[in-house]
Amino acid sequence: MSRIDFGAKPLLFPMPVLIIGTYDENGVPNTMNAAWGMISDFKEISISLSEHKTTANLAVTGEFTVSIATEDTVVACDYVGIVSANDEPDKFAKAGFHATKSDKVNAPLIDELPMALECRVKSFEDDILIGEIVNVNADESVLTDGKIDPKKLKPIAYDPANNTYVTIGDVVGKAFSDGLQLK
């Protein structure tokens, strides 16, 4: 195998496509696309964010949702990452999204995105948002035997090497199980 150097680049696979939902000071829903995020503890999510309308909203409400972008919503999810609510105040509706107020946090659940984390801001320093996960909810349509089923959810990931969105593949093994055969 021959390796090629690419230098220091943000190439990590897969990068989940996270759609952050907030309300502004007037209760108007806003959303943005963020790919640089991850679970950082059992009840914690960390997301790298520069200054946006969303970050201004977070300073006001301190609460947000993180929905998982899906194969069926690529165009809308990409749109909310391209357009700023500072320039297009109605971008939430223009994306075709509809909001239902979360009963756990002061933030919108996006009806078109079937899975969401409901979060409170723990800290936001040096462009790193750390949120406490208060609840995870999912539409029944993406469940199998009471669990979230990735095949039904159809989450997408961001491919930073090619600037594309890709689907998540098939099950190839059982976590915390298959490796036991080497013990």
Regions found by a protein language model. Give the residues of each.
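Basic, polyanion-binding surface patches
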Residues: 1-183
